[in-house]
Every structure is written in C-alpha cells, then in structure tokens.
Amino acid sequence: MSDGQWVCLSSEEFDQLQKYSEYSSKKIKDVLAEFNEGGSLKQYDPHKPISYDVFKLFMRAYLEVDLPQPLSTNLFLAFSQKPRQETPDHPKEGASSSEPNVSDSNAESTAKADAACAPDTESKPIKTQVPSEELEAAAPWGEPNAPASSSDAPIVYLKDVVCYLSLMETGRPQDKLEFMFRLYDSDENELLDQAELDQIVSQMLHVAQYLEWDPTELRPILKEMLQGMDYNKDGFVSLEEWVSGGMTTIPLLVLLGMDDSASKGDGRHAWTLKHFKKPTYCNFCHIMLMGVRKQGLCCIYCKYAVHQRCVSNSIPGCVKTYSKAKRSGEVMQHAWVEGNSSVKCDRCHKSIKCYQSVTARHCVWCRMTFHRKCELSTACDGGELKDHILLPTSIYPVTRDRQAGKSDSGAAAKGELVMQYKIIPSPGTHPLLVLVNPKSGGRQGERILQKFHYLLNPKQVFNLDKGGPTPGLNFFQDTPDFRVLACGGDGTVGWILDCIDKANFTKHPPVAVLPLGTGNDLARCLRWGGGYEGGSLTKILKEIEQSPLVMLDRWYLEVMPREEVENGDQVPYNIMNNYFSIGVDASIAHRFHVMREKHPEKFNSRMKNKLWYFEFGTSETFAATCKKLHDHIELECDGVEVDLSNIFLEGIAILNIPSMYGGTNLWGETKKNRAVIRESRKSVTDPKELKCCVQDLSDQLLEVVGLEGAMEMGQIYTGLKSAGRRLAQCSSVTIRTKKLLPMQVDGEPWMQPPCMIKITHKNQAPMMMGPPQKSSFFSLRRKSRSKD
C-alpha cells in the first residue's frame, strides 16, 4: 500500500463525532448551500479537492463549533491520501515529478476517490498526526481555481466527506438514498455508473465498520443489491432503480437508520443490528449467529433474530399491535416466537436450552415460555405487566367519518392517510404512555426506547424526537385512567407537563419519571433517583403500579425587561417546576453550559461534570463576579420588600423543591420538634419563624434562600454546611434588577439585562412517587446518633 494509507478513527473518536453532530442544528444540505453565491464558502469549488484549512471551515459550518485538533486531524486523514506515484516501483515520497491531474482525468479521479474512501480492512488501522508544515503545503488545494500539482499535500474529496456525514444524520432512508445519488451524479444526467456506485458503497462500509458491522457479510449483500438494481444491464443505475433497490435491502435500511414509526403494528419488523451476549440461533435457518462483533439482525418488537443473508427470505411477519375492527367478546391470543429462550418452562419448570429452537417458544405479550408439549390455553392476559400494557384487542381504528374530522392537516395536505385509533383498555388496568427522549443520557435514551418497544405495545411508546409529546398525548386523548412515564431529564419532564396542560384533559394524567443523564433534581425529590443506571425496567414498571400520588406546584415565570435596555439572551422557560436563581450559582451554571455547548465530548460522565463544576466554582470564588448583589437587586415577597442591605450575598435562589445541583438541599432540613405546618400562605421573613418552616413541593409556597458565595455553595454541596441563609417563605416573588446578571430556571442558564421578574402560582400537576428507599444499617446508626 502507498503512503496514503487509510487512517481509521478510534471508536472513542467516532462516538465523539456523533455527539458533535447531535448537538448541531445544521444539516449537510444546509452547509452545501454555503458554497453557492452569497455563502460563507462561496470562494471554494466543492467539486475540487480541498485543503485541511477549508476542511476545518466546512466542519465548523456543519457542527457550529471547532473540532478538537486530534479529532479534526484524524478525520481529515480518514478521507485524504497523498497523490500516488505513476510508477509503482517508486514508493518513496516525492520520487516522481509526473503526477496525474486529479481535476482533468475522470477515470484517475475516480480511482483516487475510491482509494480515499475504501478502508483497508486487512491492515492494522493507523493513527497519524498531520505535521503543521504538511498542512500548510496542502493550502493551494483549497484555492478556488487552484490547479493540481505534484505536491505531497493530502487530498480530500468533499463528496466523500458529505456522503459519510449524511449517513450519520437522522432522517428517512429514502431521503438519504436520493441525497447520495444526487451527490455523486456530478453530470446531473440522472444516472450513476459503476465507479460512482462503488464510491457510495465504500462510504457505507466505512460507517458500518465504526458501527461494529462485519463488512465481510455486508459487502456481498451490497454487491448483490447493485447487480439487482441495473435491470436492463447497461451498466448504469437510474434514481428510481437506486431508491427502489435500496428500500428493499433490509441490512442497508438498518445502516441508513430504518424509520420504525410507520411499521408499528402493520406486521413489518423493525430491525436493528445486535451483538448477542449468549448463544443465539437464526429463527429462519436455525444456524447459530456467529461473529465477534454484531452477529445478526434482531426485531426490536418481537426479538425475531436472523442472519443478514436470511432477512430477505420469506420470514414470518411481526406481531400486530391493534385489531382491524372492534369485536365484542374478542379474546386475546398468544403471539408466539420460536427459540432463543434460555429460561425455564412456565408449566413443567424444566430448563429450556437455547438450541431447542423448534421445541420451545415464548409469547411476545405476556412473556410466558413453554415447551411445545407443555402449552396450555391459547388465551393471553398480558402477563405481569398487564396493568400497563395495551393489548392489540384494546386498540382498533375509528370509522372513516370520525377520522376525517380529526385528520392531521399537515399530513392531509401531503395526501397521506392518517389513521386514528380508539382505545378501550381492559377493565381495572392503567395503560402507560411512555415518552422517551433519545438524546438524554448520551445513547441511554435510544436503548431505553428499544427496550420499552419490546416490553409494552410499540404503539404506546413514543420517541420525543418525532413530534414531541403531542402525538402520544393525542393517541391517549380519550383513554380513561392512563398514566405517563417521562424518560429523560428535568427539562423533558417540564416539556411533557406543558404539553399536558395544553391538551386540556378532563383528568390530568399522573406522571412518573425515569431519570436519564445527570442532575435530575425533580426525579430525586420524587424518589426515582438521580439517574437510571441499567436496572430492570420490568421492576420499575411494577413499582409504578404501586406508586402514591403527590401534587407538584408549578409557577409562572414572567420576565419583563426595561424598554431602554438592549435585548439579552432568550429566557429558556416561562414555567418553573424546580427552582429559579440569580447570581453566583447561575454564573457557574452559565459557564458550564457555554463550555458544554462548545466541547460536548468533555461532559460525557457524571464525574467529569462534577470536576468541571468544581473548576468553575473555584474560579468564581476568586473572580466574585456577583459580589454586593444587594446593590443591584430589589426583592419582594408577597408585596413585602425584604431588606438585603445588611446581608452580603452573591446569589439568591427561589425554591419549589428540596433539591438543587443534583441533590443539594439549600433550604436545609427542619427538625421535627420545630416543624410547623402552616395553614396560611402569608409571607414569613422573621429568622426565628423561618427555622420552623417546612419545605413541601405541594404547599403552594416558595422558599427564598441567600448564598454568600461560591465557597458556601461548595460547602453545602459537600455536606460541610447544612444549608444557605433562609430569607423568606411566600406565595409570590418579585425581583427588580439594575444590571446584567446571570440567571437560571430549572438548570437552564442565561444572561439577563435589567428587568423585573414575577413568580406566581400556576397550577398543580399529579406526580407519581417512587418507592421509599430501604434503610441500611449505617443510615440507621446515623439517625440514632442525630437523635442523641
């Protein structure tokens, strides 16, 4: 191989690149428009090789931030190679002076691009740093009309980079296929030749390797697909042939990101590539799925597993998730899937071996597993999750007249048929609407989404990336006694509560929380913990069945800037569920937020987040950007002004719940012998009375706490100090500011010019409490010591 050997990104770098693309609001199509007249990259020709400097400009326009130097360099090298020598007998750099012109020779250009985008699967991946002088030498390649030269500068073809990045984006597979077709159809004749098709497939194999696919099995599938596309055998593929062939190749659809929203319940499988932790057999050919990486395809709805080569055969359809018509007295039947059930038979209680693929099967709905000879009744009741699950017999389409009255205007404008459903749950059950934010907790949300698709009816599980909470709430609009499970952070919970308010339910559905990511102060107060750590989801669903209800106060946050000041940042929320703060803690949160937006790869764990908070808190201690806060704000509680002149504060927090900064209680605990439950909602500002005031998230009262500085915050966070300074307990708060100050609401910070802020009660939302924490021996000893 020549000097221009493929440079592979490490798995960590690939994950890092994916996180950057998730944070970006731009699409590849948006960035390509920058090469047109009036764009920021108009001086460069996208059809010619580009330099490292132009590559960085392109990536910055796409990701909206600068990539770290090592990642940027390795990604550039992943698409570049030095111009090859004409004579293979001269492998030495710079030995030949006659280098082919990459922009004049179409065949040689294709060969170079093919070499640049074809990974060397036989050789060990190398990680190389591009020397600064070599990158400087590459600059002429990025000039608008720079001719090709014999320089040793690396060459990057923009279309290869664009094709690669488009595969990582979310979107419909058919749109990605059409985009890649037009990207490589440089002569715009609506045809692709064999060399252009090979370049596209090479990029697909490149991305597939990073996703831990086995290219030795995928490559022949893609080659067979290309051969089948050319129906008239003329060596060219039209757009129609390309899209129709791609849409019928299941492994390719999985690679492109199969859209499962349209296949919920119509009998089509939703495939995902999977690495099986235990021996698993193909449900079609009954041969074990082999491989050290991802071994085969598995349906996320029914767990039907097949080889990639077997998926195109006539395999049984997926489970139906609804009934075609309402039938009185209809009994739900088991939906069987054979094999791969290494558990005990639910009748004879004898172990079922994984290789007994034809002698045992399990029901998709109730999870009962039997030997064939042990099967009992064919009726299915939903199993241990029957209180949550919507069986197919509980869902059926409504009449066409009603559907026409409720059809979605957007879909109707496109000529699409929008099917509406009626839900009649089984008596005594409480169907669960699951709303999952796939972006919460890194990739944790995506895994949770797939697990719930299997545990429950896929129709009752919704991806918040696809339309937000509204589609799920509309689906359950007339369903009695349903519950909601919000899977995400505190921001996701607030988003769902806002949409529930707008849905105008006759009865507000109770909401449980499965916390993902970091922080999760509301979930902590509701006893659901600080973050999901991979436990049994079935256990969590069983806990929701027994959950008691508590009412959560929600508050209006009205920010009214002064007319004479310039506009500041946009206020994140106008509803407060957890807390509002101004001053030192908001300053730290704002710096943390800005840094995370710029470098998301540095904030991928809870420990790293805590270290960053410690660093920003330490620097804030010395900077003291919010000192003498009392000179710049006025505080009123229930219309009574609070005197701050004799109190040296750097921050003020308005609390609705007893948790902030990921579990810190700024108000502090109130001793039981002093605790007084207040019947009136008059403002309390007397220090002696405040010692007896109890904090409660459903008392329609706010707690106002003062912070002396970043040092005090650190002491409270680490437990060296019990709480901040209690200033008031009241039912409304008004704050007037006189200068630009950092603020935050429910963990979302912003910079606010002088303004007036009013916080008033909005309503109460029913929330579900988690199970009480089990007391350990050490916690009991601590309690006994505190009593003494």
From Swiss-Prot:
One of its GO terms (biological process) is phospholipase C-activating G protein-coupled receptor signaling pathway. The activity is calcium-dependent. Requires phosphatidylserine for maximal activity. Ca(2+) 1 binds at residues 185, 187, 189, 196. Residues 95-109 have a biased composition (Polar residues). Ca(2+) 2 binds at residues 230, 232, 234, 241. Residues 172-207, 217-252 form the EF-hand domain. Pathway: Lipid metabolism; glycerolipid metabolism. Keywords: ATP-binding, Calcium, Cytoplasm, Cytoskeleton, Kinase, Lipid metabolism, Membrane, Metal-binding, Nucleotide-binding, Repeat, Transferase, Zinc, Zinc-finger. It is an enzyme of class 2 (transferase). It comes from the Eukaryota. InterPro entries: ATP-NAD_kinase_N, C1-like_sf, C1_DGKgamma_rpt2, DAG_kinase_typeI_N, DGK, DGK_typeI_N_sf, Diacylglycerol_kin_accessory, Diacylglycerol_kinase_cat_dom. Its EC number is 2.7.1.107. The keyword Lipid metabolism applies. Residues 83-93 have a biased composition (Basic and acidic residues). PROSITE patterns: DAGK (PS50146), EF_HAND_1 (PS00018), EF_HAND_2 (PS50222), ZF_DAG_PE_1 (PS00479), ZF_DAG_PE_2 (PS50081). It catalyses: a 1,2-diacyl-sn-glycerol + ATP = a 1,2-diacyl-sn-glycero-3-phosphate + ADP + H(+); 1,2-didecanoyl-sn-glycerol + ATP = 1,2-didecanoyl-sn-glycero-3-phosphate + ADP + H(+); 1,2-di-(9Z-octadecenoyl)-sn-glycerol + ATP = 1,2-di-(9Z-octadecenoyl)-sn-glycero-3-phosphate + ADP + H(+); 1-octadecanoyl-2-(9Z,12Z)-octadecadienoyl-sn-glycerol + ATP = 1-octadecanoyl-2-(9Z,12Z-octadecadienoyl)-sn-glycero-3-phosphate + ADP + H(+). One of its GO terms (molecular function) is lipid binding. Pfam families: C1_1 (PF00130), DAG_kinase_N (PF14513), DAGK_acc (PF00609), DAGK_cat (PF00781). It is found in: Membrane; Cytoplasm, Cytosol; Cytoplasm, Cytoskeleton. Belongs to the eukaryotic diacylglycerol kinase family. This is Diacylglycerol kinase gamma. It comes from Rattus norvegicus (Rat).
